[in-house]
């Protein structure tokens, strides 16, 4: 249950950041949204019990951003300088701090693809 939990969403895009923030508020979470103009983003994120990274910047969320025992959800999808697929979270840096974290690849992207396929089939059947 996320009711009353402190949640920080990094990113304010119309695709992920804003919709996720609204869904979390509807479930009575206390939501803070960070963006490129946020002052002390690391401190703001470190206050979160749940951190949602949707900034579109490869491995920008470092250990300084994550509170001990936080849940980290990485929605980002990026390619780093070496051509490797990665998320917005530096998974190796935060894995022993966070209580749980979704990896990239292999995290929420798989769920997104499944839901998209489900909606596509549903729309096709409705025709």
Question: Where in this protein do the model-derived segments appear?
Answer:
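Glycine-rich phosphate/diphosphate-binding loop of Rossmann-like nucleotide-binding domains
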Residues: 1-71, 84-95
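Rossmann-fold NAD(P)-binding glycine/threonine-rich loop
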Residues: 68, 73-127
């Amino acid at each position: 249950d996320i009711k009353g939990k402190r949640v920080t969403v990094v990113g304010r895009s119309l695709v992920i950041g804003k919709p996720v923030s609204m869904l979390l508020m509807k479930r009575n979470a206390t939501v803070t949204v960070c963006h490129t103009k946020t002052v002390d983003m690391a401190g703001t994120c470190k206050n979160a019990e749940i951190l949602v990274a949707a900034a579109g910047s490869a491995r920008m969320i470092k250990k300084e951003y994550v509170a001990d025992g936080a849940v980290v959800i990485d929605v980002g999808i990026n390619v780093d300088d070496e051509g490797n697929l990665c998320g917005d979270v530096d998974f190796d840096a935060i894995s022993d701090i966070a209580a749980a974290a979704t990896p990239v690849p292999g995290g929420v992207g798989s769920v997104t693809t499944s839901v998209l396929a489900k909606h596509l089939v549903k729309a096709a059947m409705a025709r």
